[in-house]
Amino acid sequence: HGMRLTPEGEQVYPGLRQAFEQITASLAQLEAINARQTLTVSTEPSFAATWLVPRLGQFSASHPQVEVRVEATALLADLRRERIDVAIRHGLGDYPGLDVQALMAPPLIPVASPRLLAEGPEIREAIDCLAYPLLQESERNDWRLWLRAMGVEDDPRSERGPAFADDLLLVRAAEAGQGIALVREIHARAEIASGRLAVALERPWPSRFAYYAVSLPGAAQRAPLSLFLAWLREQAAAEA
C-alpha cells in the first residue's frame, strides 16, 4: 500500500513542496557561486590596455571557472586592505613582506609620428633627439638616463617638455606629433605595426625596471591565483 496524505497534509503539501524546491535551487546557486572563483588583478593602465587585456581571453577559455577582475590604476595597491589577489607592478622588484615573481623587462624605445620625423632634422645618434621636443614620464628621468646610457653628457634639454603619468598618454602625444616619447616597446607595438608611430632610433635600452607579479605571502600557492600566475609566466616567457 502506498502512503496517502491526510486531508490536513494535502492542504500544506503544495507549500512544503515549493519550500523544498526553493531550498534545492538555493543550494545549487550556492554551489555555483563557490565553484566560480573571482580573481582581482591590479596594474597600471598602459600594461592593462596593451598587454594584459588582449591576452585575457586565453586564460578565461582555459579556466572558465575563474572570473578575472582587472583594476587599472597608476597607484600602488594595498593588497591587504583592497582585497587584491595580485598586483602587476613596474619597478625594481623591491616589495618587502610580499611574494614577488619577475615577469619581463621590456626595453625603452624612442618613438614619434612618422610625419614629425620626416619634417624634422635627421636622427643618426641619440644626441640628435635633443633637436626635437621630448615627451616625458612623470619623474622626468627616462630621457636623461637613456641619453646618458647612449654616451650623451647631461643636457638640461633632456628634462624639458610636457610630462605624462602613463605610457598610454605618452604614446597618444607622440602619435599626435607633439614630440619624441621614450616608452616601453610593448606599449607602442600596435602603433608601430600600423605605421601610426615610427622608431626614431634603433637603440632599445634594457631599463633596470621590470614587471613583477606581487602577492601576499603564501597566496601564490593557492588556486585560482596559482593558475593565473602560471599562465602569466608562460605569456611573459613568450615575450623574452
What positions do the PLM features span?
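Central regulatory/effector-binding core of bacterial HTH transcription factors
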Residues: 36-96
